[in-house]
Amino acid sequence: MGKIIGIDLGTTNSCVAVMEGGQPTVIANQEGNRTTPSVVAFTKSGERLVGQVAKRQAITNPENTVFSIKRFMGRRYDEVNEEMKMVPYKVVRGENGDARVDIMGKKYSPPEISAMILTKLKEAAESYLGEKVTQAVITVPAYFNDAQRQATKDAGKIAGLDVLRIINEPTAAALAYGLDKKKNETIAVYDFGGGTFDISVLEVGEGVVEVKSTNGDTHLGGDNIDQRVIDWIVSEFKKENGIDLSKDQMALQRLKEAAEKAKMELSTLLETEINLPFITADATGPKHLQMRLSRSRFEQMVEDILQRSMGPCKQAMTDASVTPSQIDEVVLVGGQTRMPRIQTLVRELFQRDPHQGVNPDEVVAIGAAVQGGVLGGEVKDVLLLDVTPLSLGIETMGGVFTKLIERNTTIPTRKSEVFSTASDNQPSVEIKVYQGERAMARDNRLLGVFQLGNIPPAPRGVPQIEVTFDIDANGILNVTAKDRGTNNEQKITITSSSGLSKDEVEKMARDAEANAADDRKLKDTIDARNRADAMVYNVEKTLKEHRAKVGEAEAKEIEAALEETKKTLNENDAEKINAAVDRLTTASHKLAEAMYKSSSQPGAQEAPPTDGQPKPDEKGKDNVVDAEFVDVDDKK
């Protein structure tokens, strides 16, 4: 069996590693660098460039140089408006509604572009190992959804790699950190990358890495910080010279490089100079850009972006039921964590100095290589237990979101529940799969829809539809709906979902608590309405079949209670609906009594109960079992 490589497919940079002699080794690329810029360029002559060489020519070829493609992976065109503003290349709508990159008239999918980066890393590994590489473990942000994970797997396939496992970046970092740890520790992995932010709380030690909780924001990263600096430079230059550099793509590409360089320098310096000669020209001649940026001004400029990482950290600790004092180490991942202000925020929140013993650019790839070693049998006695970041479920009657798998459930996992039809002789059911934390389905993220048809005609509530959610070790979801009566089955692998927007993540996970009271009230009302609807249906059906067994006065009393209950079905008051149902239940008791008396007469037919309960066993003529009772005096 060949070597299994570990790949960190990053927004800004990517890295590849492999296990050798029981230890992970980072593999340098063909240029001798341990990380490779996640940049792909297409020249006018048709040549394709990847990595540092592509990044170097970006200034002169901005429209055909693709970077930060990870931000478009598995996302629909309608959801990448903010990302599109941050890149000079053309992003267009694909035939299926997904985002595509248009390079000189040819449309590329994000997995295709990512595959070009993966191919370069794969070739570097093959050159280093002296053998063909066909298998890999690739990392993704913990908050990546199903479509984004699937897109990453597809990129691997396009690059000729069998992706044995997709693992979360913070989990990979914890694997690398905890490889030699003998004592048990609770750690937090704070992963601030180029395009995404993740936080995970884990327990590591004695070969076990168990994720307790995870949270994050797939629209928060170093790119946002770079963009803020670019906007500041454009604004300052416009004030001084009256020229808007944001309209010049070539100038913007130079500004992007300058902003990134200034950001990096301000991690070690208190002030930096941004110097871009001949940035543009007007009628008076060429213009040069020269300005100074202090660390304090820079930190003020991006403080709100950095603060966005604090909410997920607090939520992750709450979900893991730990306090900052119970966390033994905070491991920083991602080049952005070199920023002093981020380290200060982490120190203030977790009440300890962050761990500096790992390389934030390489630790994720190292962890992926460790997982590759586990899968290949090279690394023994290491157990990885990851979780799903958001709850998963389906829409049920009244638009309620019924969770089948709760967030932070250890994966792989499988959960089944039985549902039924909502109307008589319903020929099919539509299964709508959602991801989120809100009580109502509409407030969550729709992942996919599929139909289960050919349901035999039957009264509502009779067919048994078994819905099964199955999350594999890659975090990819499969949903199956099966009619237990016919064994007819439909299955969907959720691949049509898209990235969660900045506000949607908050709506799903962190704002769920703020909306909990309203959600609960609405859910109670719908539950009451469903109960009333079922009661009305059962009583109407029974009254129609057995009206002759009760007097006219009793029948009219039941009908009046039915009408009153029907009127409350449009109310948004659970108490009012429940009160009407109670009155209907009381009124229908007389019908039940009459049916019971009738059924006890010789030769009488057994009538169905009015409360929707299962009928007694019909195999025998009655269900009475003769038995002798012995009074036992138990003396101890």
UniProtKB/Swiss-Prot annotation:
The keyword Cell division does not apply. It holds the Pfam family HSP70. Residues 614-624 have a biased composition (Basic and acidic residues). The keyword Nucleotide-binding applies. Induction: By stress conditions e.g. heat shock. The modification Phosphothreonine is found at residue 196. GO terms for molecular function: ATP binding; ATP-dependent protein folding chaperone; unfolded protein binding. PANTHER family: HEAT SHOCK PROTEIN 70KDA. It comes from the Bacteria. Acts as a chaperone. Keywords: ATP-binding, Chaperone, Nucleotide-binding, Phosphoprotein, Stress response. Belongs to the heat shock protein 70 family. This is Chaperone protein DnaK. Residues 591-636 are annotated as: Disordered. InterPro entries: ATPase_NBD, Chaperone_DnaK, Heat_shock_70_CS, HSP70_C_sf, HSP70_peptide-bd_sf, Hsp_70_fam.
